[in-house]
């Protein structure tokens, strides 16, 4: 059975044409992207690395990593977001290889081929996130790094990521997130270890509605990123 939620794919298909509009529903992704790329680059040294971006969508993270000197492949199951990513490539001139394929299929095809694997803001949109993490382990080279991000599952996360972001501040379209699919750091850590990935670091991402700025912080109550490594 394919690890794809077609309703989730449809959500982003409908919005795909606005992916690179920095004032659209994708503004939060644009705003947090520099923080995420810097955090990954500081730990992995992207220049010259072969990188796979799982759930790449319209290519915001993929292009940013390519601009840091990485050789990037971006994969997604959404046809419209990938079309937008390829179209934006023509405008930006940034080289990324985009493919419509699941992480699990890619792991069968190219095991152990990547220095770095990223899977950001994607795990909470698939039926079986642990399966994606196992695929990440198969895809990354021994000694390589896997970076994951998602949203914690607790009352504060529901208040901030669903009620606050979707209903009050209207940063995201209503229905973007399903609280039941949010993932606690303990769960993400357990799935990573079971897959053969060692958790090296964790950082939170917080939003100040007054200044409208995001920053990295030790608060992992809502959004957070995890650095993991496959044994050499």
Curated annotation (Swiss-Prot):
It comes from the Bacteria. Its EC number is 2.1.1.222, 2.1.1.64. Keywords: Methyltransferase, S-adenosyl-L-methionine, Transferase, Ubiquinone biosynthesis. It is an enzyme of class 2 (transferase). GO terms for molecular function: 2-polyprenyl-6-hydroxyphenol methylase activity; 3-demethylubiquinol 3-O-methyltransferase activity; methyltransferase activity; polyprenyldihydroxybenzoate methyltransferase activity. It catalyses: a 3-demethylubiquinol + S-adenosyl-L-methionine = a ubiquinol + S-adenosyl-L-homocysteine + H(+); a 3-(all-trans-polyprenyl)benzene-1,2-diol + S-adenosyl-L-methionine = a 2-methoxy-6-(all-trans-polyprenyl)phenol + S-adenosyl-L-homocysteine + H(+). S-adenosyl-L-methionine binds at residues 36, 55, 76, 120. Gene3D superfamilies: Vaccinia Virus protein VP39 (3.40.50.150). GO terms for biological process: methylation. Pathway: Cofactor biosynthesis; ubiquinone biosynthesis. Pfam families: Methyltransf_23 (PF13489). O-methyltransferase that catalyzes the 2 O-methylation steps in the ubiquinone biosynthetic pathway. Belongs to the methyltransferase superfamily. UbiG/COQ3 family. PANTHER family: METHYLTRANSFERASE, UBIQUINONE BIOSYNTHESIS O-METHYLTRANSFERASE, MITOCHONDRIAL. This is Ubiquinone biosynthesis O-methyltransferase. It comes from Pseudomonas aeruginosa (strain ATCC 15692 / DSM 22644 / CIP 104116 / JCM 14847 / LMG 12228 / 1C / PRS 101 / PAO1). The gene is ubiG.
């Amino acid at each position: 059975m394919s690890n794809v939620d077609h309703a989730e794919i449809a959500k982003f298909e409908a919005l795909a044409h606005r992916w690179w509009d920095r004032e659209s529903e994708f503004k939060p992704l644009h705003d947090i992207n520099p923080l995420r790329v810097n955090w990954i680059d500081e730990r992995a040294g992207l220049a010259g690395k072969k990188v796979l971006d799982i759930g790449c969508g319209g290519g915001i993270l993929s292009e940013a990593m390519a601009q840091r000197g990485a050789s990037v492949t971006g994969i997604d199951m959404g046809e419209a977001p990938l079309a937008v990513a390829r179209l934006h490539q023509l405008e930006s001139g940034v080289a990324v290889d985009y493919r419509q394929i699941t992480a699990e299929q890619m792991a069968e095809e190219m095991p152990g081929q990547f220095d770095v694997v990223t899977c950001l803001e994607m795990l909470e949109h698939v039926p079986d996130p642990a399966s994606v993490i196992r695929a990440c382990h198969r895809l990354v080279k021994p000694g390589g790094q896997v970076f994951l991000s998602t949203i914690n599952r607790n009352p504060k996360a529901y208040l901030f990521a669903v009620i606050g972001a979707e209903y009050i501040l209207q940063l995201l379209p209503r229905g973007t997130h399903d609280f039941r699919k949010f993932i606690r750091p303990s769960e993400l850590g357990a799935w990573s270890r079971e897959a053969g990935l060692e958790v090296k670091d964790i950082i939170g991402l917080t939003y100040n509605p007054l200044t409208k700025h995001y920053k990295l912080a030790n608060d992992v109550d809502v959004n957070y990123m995890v650095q993991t490594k496959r044994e050499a």
